[in-house]
Amino acid sequence: MGITGAMKIAHLAETLGLDVELHACGPAHRHCMAAIRNTNYYELALVGPKCRNPLPHIYTCGYSDQLDCIDSEGYVPVPIGPGLGVTYDWDYIDHHRIALHEFV
């Protein structure tokens, strides 16, 4: 579905007076939530005070979806910068890749 599809669904829900929630975490989700008026909750996957997020650390810019990314008022920052506002650790990603599909 991607960002465009998520935004279309959010706008449709808004016209019907409904809220929409994005059930995952990540830079794209934060950007979408910042642009959607009818969303309320940012989901952090499988985290708790003694349970770290199992998603690998693939960012080199300090981006995190751990509990410590939530500020004192309960907000998470939206990454700034080109694209989604994050930089990726391509060495880590390449080292842990299990397949490569190239589409020409």
Outline where the language-model segments fall.
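Shared catalytic-loop signature of beta/alpha-barrel
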Residues: 1-75, 79
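Extended hydrophobic packing segments that form well-structured cores
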Residues: 82-104
